[in-house]
């Protein structure tokens, strides 16, 4: 395997350098400082290769069935998210106390109902697209679905929300139950390129697959690439590295709705947006959290580029089976410019390894994040969730009947 060959070469090189030092190339007084940058990079490279090898050795694919018709890759997430309610069940009082933290939905007698006021209509539309085809197969149930960006049940807040509340993203500090975000069908951040949100994951998959095929690995630009707004200063060091070393990184800030002056783009004019398809021109793509998990991550993988994912606290339902060093390159929160430089330099020198990781990341998303996987996840989630209800669901006059939109009939 390629990783073993590279490790052996590095070991031989490191041992040779150690032997040379023992023969007097560095005096005892100089040992702490005489190693040059190539020595440092070799040691760094060895550590990275060791991490990759360890990750691959322990990695078990989530399904032996490439078709994975039962979306078994994501089943553990459902079990984990519902576990806090297994002992107590879900009572009517729990639903009522949680209602103000999300949008009330009800499935009753094979029909879907919702409270009339939806804070984000496009987001509700994206959710309802997946719920409507399922209602004929599901028992009666009440749901509280959060359409805000931020999860609602932080165990440290003590805000009275005991759940259950469904949210698209969370951290380990939250008890929200994750569901596939509305953006798989509608909504998402409104940008100049996508004024109504990215939407239609099925269509974007096909676009990115065609674009990636048109720009094979050997034709991609050997640069780190990022384009996005400054929703967090965690992204600043990559932008500053790009200004200092544009031969290594091409990263710039774009405008968002809160932009007022160049200070909001780190004292530079805002850059133009870049389509996901044009991200595929670059070998190394960076993903950062936003207010919560970033909607861009799943798109980046389909470029068949190497994804660098910064931070691991924010999750969506499919993140659990994406493994660091197997499918992507992990970085801790707030990486320094030096950390970016070292990793990019390493993967430039180990191009075949970079391509292998990129391919595994692409294959996982392509095989296990299809539209049928999204539908399957919703079905499995709701069938497991309804078993927790401890009361008989009743009709409510104040809820409105949701029917399929005309363009979905």
UniProtKB/Swiss-Prot annotation:
Enzyme Commission number(s) of this protein: 2.4.1.-
Keyword Endoplasmic reticulum tagged: yes
Region of interest: Interaction with the consensus sequence C-X-S-X-[PA]-C in peptide substrates: 190-195
Protein name as catalogued: O-glucosyltransferase rumi
Motif Prevents secretion from ER mapped to chain: 406-409
Binding site for UDP-alpha-D-glucose: 227-231, 235, 274-276, 292-296
Pathway: Protein modification; protein glycosylation
Keywords from the named record: Disulfide bond, Endoplasmic reticulum, Glycosyltransferase, Notch signaling pathway, Signal, Transferase
Main location: endoplasmic reticulum
Role, per record: Protein O-glucosyltransferase. Catalyzes the reaction that attaches glucose through an O-glycosidic linkage to a conserved serine residue found in the consensus sequence C-X-S-X-[PA]-C in epidermal growth factor-like repeats. Regulates Notch signaling by glucosylating Notch in the ER, glucosylation is required for the correct folding and cleavage of Notch.
Catalytic residue list: 149
Residues marked Interaction with the consensus sequence C-X-S-X-[PA]-C in peptide substrates (site): 120, 230, 257
Cellular location(s): Endoplasmic reticulum lumen
GO terms for biological process, alphabetical: negative regulation of Notch signaling pathway; Notch signaling pathway; positive regulation of Notch signaling pathway; protein O-linked glycosylation via serine
Organism from which the protein derives: Drosophila pseudoobscura pseudoobscura
Family: Belongs to the glycosyltransferase 90 family.
Gene that this sequence comes from: rumi
GO cellular component, one term: endoplasmic reticulum lumen
Signal sequence residues: 1-20
Disulfide-bond pairs as recorded: 62-73, 71-376, 118-124, 280-303
């Amino acid at each position: 395997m390629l990783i073993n060959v590279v490790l052996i070469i590095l070991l031989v090189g490191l041992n040779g350098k150690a032997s040379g030092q023992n023969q007097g190339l560095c005096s005892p007084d100089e040992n702490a400082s005489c190693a040059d940058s190539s020595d440092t990079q070799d040691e760094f490279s060895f550590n990275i290769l060791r991490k990759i090898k360890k990750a691959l050795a322990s990695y078990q694919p989530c399904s032996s069935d490439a078709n994975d018709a039962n979306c078994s890759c994501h089943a553990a997430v459902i079990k984990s998210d519902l576990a806090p309610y297994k002992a107590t069940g879900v009572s009517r009082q729990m639903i009522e106390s949680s209602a103000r933290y999300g949008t009330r939905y009800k499935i009753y007698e094979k029909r879907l109902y919702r409270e009339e006021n939806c804070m984000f209509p496009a987001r509700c539309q994206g959710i309802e697209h997946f719920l409507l085809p399922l209602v004929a197969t599901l028992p009666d149930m009440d749901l509280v679905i959060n359409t805000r960006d931020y999860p609602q049940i932080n165990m440290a807040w003590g805000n009275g929300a005991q759940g259950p509340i469904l949210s698209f993203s969370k951290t380990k500090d939250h008890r929200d139950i994750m569901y596939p975000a509305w953006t798989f069908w509608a909504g998402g951040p409104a940008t100049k390129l996508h004024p109504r949100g990215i939407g239609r994951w099925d269509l974007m998959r096909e676009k990115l697959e065609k674009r990636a095929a048109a720009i094979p690995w050997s034709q991609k630009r050997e640069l780190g690439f990022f384009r996005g707004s400054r929703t967090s200063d965690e992204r600043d060091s990559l932008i500053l590295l790009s200004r200092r070393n544009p031969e290594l990184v091409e990263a710039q800030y774009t405008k968002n709705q809160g932009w007022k002056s160049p200070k909001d783009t780190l004292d530079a004019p805002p850059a133009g947006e870049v389509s996901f398809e044009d991200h595929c021109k670059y070998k190394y793509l960076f993903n950062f959290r936003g207010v919560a998990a970033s909607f861009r991550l799943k798109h980046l993988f389909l470029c068949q580029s190497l994804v660098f994912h910064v931070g691991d606290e924010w999750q969506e339902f499919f993140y659990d089976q994406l493994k660091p060093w197997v499918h992507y390159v992990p970085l801790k929160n707030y990486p320094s410019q030096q950390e970016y430089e070292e990793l990019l330099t390493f993967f430039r020198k180990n191009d075949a390894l970079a391509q292998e990781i990129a391919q595994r990341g692409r294959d996982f998303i392509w095989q296990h994040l299809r539209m049928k996987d999204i539908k399957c996840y919703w079905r499995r989630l709701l069938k497991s969730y309804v078993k927790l209800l401890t009361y008989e669901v009743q009709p409510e006059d104040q809820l409105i009947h949701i029917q399929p939109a005309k363009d979905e009939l």
